[in-house]
């Protein structure tokens, strides 16, 4: 299955405690069907000091979200949208916004 959301995309959370927040996708975990979004789903982790540079204590970091909890934000219309696929004349497959019809992939 083709990936509708990729690393570097801007997404909006549509359900849960962070509903309405937007952020950039840092990492996609396809086997787990999850992704990590910058500034969303922040959790606190208790960390031991390791080595000389690492400081211990309580740190905040982003936890993974399920794909179904986010929608891609179209760069042209700036709205959360569903994603479709089109095949161009040159044979390349691109993602497009289902609200405004603009191509999302940058080339």
From Swiss-Prot:
SUPFAM superfamilies: Translation proteins SH3-like domain (SSF50104)
GO CC field: ribonucleoprotein complex; ribosome
Keywords: Ribonucleoprotein, Ribosomal protein, RNA-binding, rRNA-binding
Pfam (any one): ribosomal_L24
GO BP, sorted A to Z: translation
Keyword rRNA-binding carried by entry: yes
Keyword rRNA-binding attached: yes
InterPro entries: KOW (IPR005824), Rib_uL2_dom2 (IPR014722), Ribosomal_uL24 (IPR003256), Ribosomal_uL24_CS (IPR005825), Ribosomal_uL24_KOW (IPR041988), Translation_prot_SH3-like_sf (IPR008991)
Stated family: Belongs to the universal ribosomal protein uL24 family.
Subunit composition and interactions: Part of the 50S ribosomal subunit.
Protein name: Large ribosomal subunit protein uL24
UniProt source species: Fervidobacterium nodosum (strain ATCC 35602 / DSM 5306 / Rt17-B1)
């Amino acid at each position: 299955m083709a990936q509708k959301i990729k690393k570097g995309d801007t997404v909006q959370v549509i359900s849960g405690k962070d509903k309405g927040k937007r952020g950039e996708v840092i990492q996609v975990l396809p086997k787990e069907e999850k992704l990590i979004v910058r500034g969303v789903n922040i959790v606190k982790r208790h960390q031991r000091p390791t080595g000389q540079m690492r400081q211990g204590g309580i740190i905040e970091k982003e936890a993974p979200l399920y794909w179904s909890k986010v929608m891609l934000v179209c760069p042209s219309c700036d709205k959360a949208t569903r994603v479709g696929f089109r095949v161009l004349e040159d044979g390349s497959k691109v993602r497009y916004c289902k609200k405004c019809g603009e191509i999302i992939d940058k080339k």
